[in-house]
Amino acid sequence: MRDLIDSDVLRHAVNSTMERYPYFCVELQKKGEQYIFAENHRPVVITNSLHGVDLNTEDSNFHMIAFCFQDNWIILDVFHGMTDGTGAYEVLRTLLYYYCSERYHVKLNDEGIRLAGDAVSEEEWVDPVANRNDLPIPPRNEMSNALNLIASAGLENDHRHTVYSISISESEFMRFNLDNDGSPGTMVSLLLSRAIAKLYPDSKDPIRITLCVNQRIALHTPLAHQSLVGGIMLEYKDKMRDWPLERQGTAYRGMVFAQNQEENVLMGVASQAGISRMILSKESDQERLGVVGYINSLAGRVITATVSYVGKANYREAEQYIRDFRLWTSSAAKGLTVEISAVNGRFTLDFLQTFSSPVFVNAFLKELEDNGIVYDLQDVNKLELPNIKLPWTE
């Protein structure tokens, strides 16, 4: 934030915010052989720390969500299995409205912001996938192995999780996208693909980037709070390497357009639902963890890296009080995830790595330089995320 955090005001803001989101006031419990989110009426925890507390433990009052602060930072920690970036952004819009209104003694415009006292609609509450039996059957596609960043760079012994944060002017990057038939997510995916290709020009394995997609549009459930994230596969084909950037951008946008058609997204939903049913059909937690491990290893084999862009944050009038914004997540597979956020006139690209080497960040920055894109490498941090105590790990 622009100024030091007032802990009393933050407490008031969190209380009002969580009143608006009862479906996030829960704890994860084991009931028989199943797991459920049970109501949790304990206060949501706020700590004076940058590292927060372990979620779903006594320290977090057994919540799957918590807040912390230090100096001028406010941090929201939330279980990704409960919601995704879209859902977390809604919580932050509400929190920032309440916090900034009281902290700066102003009346902010509340249009489009969810507030305490609102009626929570069924569309916001109910899982849009749980009872769907009309989803299209996904084809059984076998994908070849993708170029593996860790193996290619010889980083098997580098286990220091690290985040590199890069900022770019929003207006300048959007102009660059317009000139090259791109959009933020596709262009970052393309520039990353180009950077990796130049590092490994003789690789026989394809460079395949997963671009995250919001499934709410295809499900016609824009208000749903659940974690509804699918993926689009962007493969940097050999024949594309000699194309000009604009033609490459058009090709990537074409891949996005085709895979983002409603039926294709719904097939992805069906595939994820099928995996969930398969996991839950196992009789023991050990068997379920075995299936999860297999799925994660499969994803790690067919994906080179992941790029995620929730969309412009649009924190409304509260953005004037925001100095910096970061979006950090943990990756299911070992490797690289790039989280893109757009707040207060700039894009921030967080390179979230399960290793510390700057080889891929440096290659990406060289790609920015070669294309005349001005950037600021803000900082490099150890990637530390709160632990989540899950019942099946006991």
Segments from the language model and where they lie:
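Non-catalytic, low-complexity flexible loops and terminal extensions
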Residues: M1, M82-E90, T94-R175, L368-E394
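Gly/Ser/Thr-rich phosphate-binding loops and adjoining beta-strand/alpha-helix segments
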Residues: M1-D8, D59-I74, A151-R216, F347
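Acyl-thioester-dependent acyl-group transfer interface
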Residues: M1-Q34, H41-A66, K198-E394
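Conserved aromatic-histidine-acidic binding/catalytic patches
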Residues: R2-I5, F79-G87, S165, F176-P184, ...
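Conserved catalytic core of two-metal-ion nucleotidyltransferases
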Residues: Y35-E39, L115-A116
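Histidine-centered acyl-transfer/condensation active-site motif
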Residues: S60-H105, E111-E124, S203, S341-F360
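Hydrophobic/aromatic-lined pockets within catalytic cores
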Residues: T83, L96-C100, L178-D181, L192-P201, ...
